[in-house]
Every structure is written in C-alpha cells, then in structure tokens.
Amino acid sequence: MVSSITRIQNYVIDGAATSNGLETVLESNFAPSLISLPATPLFGTDGIRGKVGELLSAPLALQIGFWAGVVLRNHADQLGPVILGQDSRNSSDMLAMALSAGLTAAGLEVWYLGLCPTPCVAYLTSMSEAIGGVMISASHNPPEDNGIKIFGANGGKLSQALQAEIEKGLRGNLPITSNVSNCGRHYSRWELVKNYGEALKRPWQNKVNLQGMKVVLDLAWGAAVGLAPSVFAEMGAEVISLHNAADGDRINVNCGSTHLEMLQAAVQEHNADLGFAFDGDADRVLAVDPTGRPVNGDYILYLWGLYLKQQNQLPDNLIVSTVMANLGFEKAWQQQGGKLIRTAVGDQYVQAEMIKTGAMLGGEQSGHILCSHYGMTGDGLLTALHLASLVKQSGVSLAELIDQSFQTYPQLLRNVRVVDRDRRLSWQNCTPVQQAIALAEKAMGDTGRILVRASGTEPVIRVMVEAANAELANYWTNELVAQVQQHLAP
C-alpha cells in the first residue's frame, strides 16, 4: 500500500491528486486546522513573518512544519533529521513546538537546539546529515512579531521553487496526517550549539588573536546572548556586553542593529576599539568605530573585499550587493579595479547571484554579509570576528580604515506604514506614486537614485533617495513619502 506521506508528496509536486480524492485514502489522526492565509504569497524576502495572533499562530506553524517536512523529504537524497532553533521571543517556544509537531507528523526526526543564532542552524544543517533546518525568529522586528525561516540541506535559504511547493500544500486545504508507524521523533540537541561556537573561532586559530582589543557587544536581548561574548573573550578580547540576556519582551527594543545609540555611547564611554550590534537572531551585524561613528554593511563589504583582493582570494574582484548599496561604495570599489553587481533587497537574492556568478563575497547595507568560503548564510558573529581581525591585522584603528575607504552619497531612507498587506504588495499599481517617482528620476538624472519597495519583513513601504547633496535627497524623499502616505496609507 502506498503511504499517505507518499501520496501527499505526489499532490504537492505533481498536482496529480485532487483534494477530495486524496482525503478519502488518508488515515488521519488530526482534523484539518482552521488557518487563514493572505491572498498574497506567504513567503517574503526572509521566510514567513508577521504578528503573532494575526498571521502567525500555532495551527499555522503546525501546518508549515508538516508541509515543509513533506517537501524537504521529497527532495532529499536520503532521509535525515531537520534542525530547529529559535530566538528569545515569548512566542518562539509555542511556534517551535508546533512546527516540530508538524515535522514529526511528516515522519521526520527533529533535532531541537533551543536558543541559538540563525547562522548556527544553517551551519549545523550544512555540516550534518540533516535534510533541512528551520529557525523561529523575526530577526530585527519587534517582540510582537515572529517568523519562520527554512533552510535546505546545504544550509542556504530554501529556494523560491521549494517555498512555492510548501505554500501549495498549505493552500490545498488537506488534513495533516500521521500514524504510529510513520511518526518522527523530537530530540533536544542543545550541545550542538557549542560546535558552532568552535567553528566561529577556527579561521583564526594560530593566526590572529584579539588580545589588547576592547570590544562592546550589543546582543539585543536576542539569540546571540552568552555565545557572542564568550567567543570574543576566547579570542582574547576584553568584552563589554549590553542587553546580554534572553528577554522576549525586550528583544530589539531600542537596541541592537536597528538602534545604535546605546552602543555608540558605550564605545566612547569605555574607550573601546570598536563595537558590534546584532539583531534578534544574529544573522546581521553593524559596527561602531572608536569615535562612535556607525559602520554599515557597505563599509564592511568594502574592507573585507579589499583584504581578499590584496590576498588574491577574490574571484574576478567581484562583490554582490543590493539596490540599497550606496553609490559612493560602488564608485570606490570600481576605482580599486572591482566590480559590484546589484540584486533585489534580501540576502536570498544576494545568495542566488553569488551562486550564479561564483562570487565569494556579498551582502547588504543592513549588515547581512555572506562569504561563500564559510557558507551561504549571513552570519553576524562571523562577520564581527572578521572585521575585528582585519582591524587587528591592519595596525590602525577602524576609524582610520573608514576614513581611507570612501565617502557616501547622501542617502535617506523613510518607512511608511501600510497595514493593508495586499495594498502594500501591489503598490506599483498606484499611478500617482509611479508618476511622482518618474518626476524625481527625471529631475535628478544620473546624479541620484530612487528606490521605492514594499518590505518583505515589515508592514511598511520603504522610500530611499540618494542624491548628490543632502538638500536634494531630503526634498525628493519628502515628496515621495507624501505621495505614498496619501494614496497607500490613508
């Protein structure tokens, strides 16, 4: 007899069976969960993300776990576990357990890591017999949000094609099925997080240490607590930690990579060499130099790229970034004999372009940095260790390295809250907004750039204007924001 899992796989992949026909042959232990899905695609630029109790719920996580399990299993060369981790949000326990129930209902073994950074899940997935990984986190979003990120067996973000297969299953209105003979098991494997910590230090063993450096770390009450300070201390640095406890009520609140003010003050107060701010799941990081000046992903990519180029380790002197990368960065990198390729915003697009072109280094202005030598997922801790090591090896301060790099073009970024998801994702159909963009682009010509886009992770439309001077950038930003507010966010 063909198992119910096999028949569901056939439905998801081939569309060969109808919903009603399939339901008649399933030995179901679970009634179909009542879930409400938006009309627009569920997966955004960084997995599935939304407010808990609105978009995200335990029933939905159960369904996602089941259908993700079916799809991962169908595409696996051989059966293996799924690695599951989470950040510190109050809702993460609930979603992780529900998702694990779905995965085990799909017949898969779950290795549960508990609290850990997203790149820890990606690394352990790629270095084990796992067929996939899942992280429960909403990254830099506020505490009331949460999300589900799914990784393939290689530790990279799941492809859009496989995401579409999962969503097809979710929208098929089929019951979750399982029986005693095909249930998977859930195992706590907290000890594996230590393996990730050791891997972070490995590139510099017997080469570079951070002795004599004072580093301030803002852990954002999130997934990097404990781990990041211990790794930096073991590398020899004197560490001062901010927000270094797992706190689901305060994760990312006025701290971390989206709020650098406390880190800037602490770096100057303690006369530190540099500071790092992580987001809630530690897949991104921003830095602060000794003067308190912010150092974003553009600068990190430039400095890391220049180091690799000088070592003849950067294929074709190529860096992949996004449409958000500053023109100043691009022009400076070109002057170094390098080439910059831009993608849509989202590290999954950067990852795809890196694979396509064979690029070693890529990332985003927001602090997602990918180096294919270490994997294909942004890793805030690895990036921070690399930048600290570059500073130590250079013999000069991070402030001096930044002064020697490039001048940015004035760039303004404003977020306009648009609660209606369908209106937000279809904003390009709004004629007045499109006309305003065309007018601004014509006025600035090749001396500036405009980017308007719906966020894939937050209920906002982002308006970015880059211009030859701050006055122009401010003027056109205000004009475009007014149009978006008037026509899309009444």
From Swiss-Prot:
Mind naming one GO cellular-component term on file for this protein?
cytosol
- Spell out the protein name for this chain: Phosphoglucosamine mutase
Alphabetical UniProt keywords: Isomerase, Magnesium, Metal-binding, Phosphoprotein
Q: What does this protein do?
A: Catalyzes the conversion of glucosamine-6-phosphate to glucosamine-1-phosphate.
How does the cofactor attach, per the note?
A: Binds 1 Mg(2+) ion per subunit.
Residue sites binding Mg(2+) per the record:
S139, D279, D281, D283
Active site positions, chain numbering: S139 (phosphoserine intermediate)
What family does this belong to?
Answer: Belongs to the phosphohexose mutase family.
What CDD domains does the record point to? GlmM
Q: Which HAMAP family does UniProt cross-reference here?
A: GlmM_B
Phosphoserine modification sites are: S139
Q: Which organism is it from?
A: Nostoc sp. (strain PCC 7120 / SAG 25.82 / UTEX 2576)
> What modifications follow translation?
Activated by phosphorylation.
* Molecular-function annotations in GO: magnesium ion binding; phosphoglucosamine mutase activity; phosphomannomutase activity
- Catalytic activity entry: alpha-D-glucosamine 1-phosphate = D-glucosamine 6-phosphate
**If you read the UniProt record, what top EC class would you report for this enzyme, in one word?**
isomerase
